[in-house]
Amino acid sequence: MNTQLQDALITQAEGHAAALTKYRGAATAARFSDPRTEFDGLRTGCGVYDLGFRAKISLTGDDRVRWLNGMVTNNIRDLAQGHGVYAFLLNPQGRILGDMVAYNLGESLLVDTDRGQVEKILATFDHYIIMDDVEVENLSDKLTAVGVRGPSSRAILQGAGLKIPELMPLQTFSLQCDCECGCMDCTIVRGEDPAHEEYEIWVAPQFVEQLWKALLAAGATPVGAEALEMDRIASGIPLYGVDIRERDLPQETEQARALNFSKGCYVGQEIVERIRSRGNVHRKFIGFVSQNGAPITVGAKVMIGDAAGEKEVGEITSATTLALQSIALGYIRREHAIPHKEVTIAGEKAWVAALPFAEAGSLVSEPDRKPAIQEA
């Protein structure tokens, strides 16, 4: 976490003993109040949160576009200036080494990933740059970010002096903010989900505390890592290192947004194309809902069967509790990936659920009713 922001976050954490926590490779605030209240702010108002756990890598040089296009699973070659795409970095066996959002900033490409992944990604980049005109620079100590999410996000940005046009998902917009806390250059990025208002604000580290204060003054609710994790799981978004591991294949993760099948060759592409042409993988990423509200444990096995015996068909990778309902993310064998199918997790009955989950308030806990789940 940026040190300029750290003291401000500790002060605002309302005396909680665990004010700071390690989240996605960086120290950040665990909570500012009740995480359920913070989660509600993300869903019904506007939450503001530290994005110091994200790392930024710059790619320059004449070969940068061709080279990165040959490294990742999405189309960098045709990426318009000021836009980004989500992508995987694979090994030659088609397994996932990391995930990222790659942006075309004109004179450079910018790779945005978690700090917990940055060293592996940098090492992989270094290994594959041979005679290419590509320069790689880790900007993580020169560029940091704050995020806002919720239906009031655009109004909060404007209230903080950040007036932006309508942006497409993963589109960037650079401006100079002249707010009560001072003047700063920043870049605003629209979130990937077009159904939700979500923005990242990239600034130099020396400006991040005043940006934070300006957003709070405009009416945003401060949100810590615990509520962010609740929101991530409710949104059905897998996290690398937790839900996506190096042993996983791209199609198993159900993240079609990361794949482009017409872009040409890249590291691991042969395996990805073979899966596409020959049929589906044996398991898929999906959601689970407890029937009686019993907590679901990360690492638990997903079972099906009857009195005659049970068999393992999946695993839990992330879990949380919302509105008295326990929900989870994980993998299940494809033939059992049917919304509302009954399974057993650690001896408790649960349902398979399509992703993303419905809004938390509509999830039900009665064991004799099926959960209100949005179809994928």
What are these language model-derived features?
Residues 1-86, 90, 95-97, 376:
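Acidic, proline/glycine-enriched N-terminal capping motif
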Residues 47, 56, 78-79, 101-232, ...:
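Acidic, low-complexity central loop/insert segments
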Residues 35-44, 83, 87-99, 129-132, ...:
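Short amphipathic beta-strand starts and helix->beta connectors
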Residues 61, 111, 148-150, 201, ...:
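Residue-level signal for inorganic ion chemistry
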Residues 2, 100, 249, 253-259, ...:
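Glycine-rich, small/acidic residue-mixed loop/short-helix segments
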Residues 81-83, 165-178, 236, 241, ...:
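Glycine-centered loop/turn motifs
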Residues 202-289:
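Anionic-ligand-binding alpha/beta catalytic cores of soluble enzymes and soluble regulatory domains
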Residues 63-68, 118-121, 153-157, 207-214, ...:
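Short, conserved charged micro-motifs
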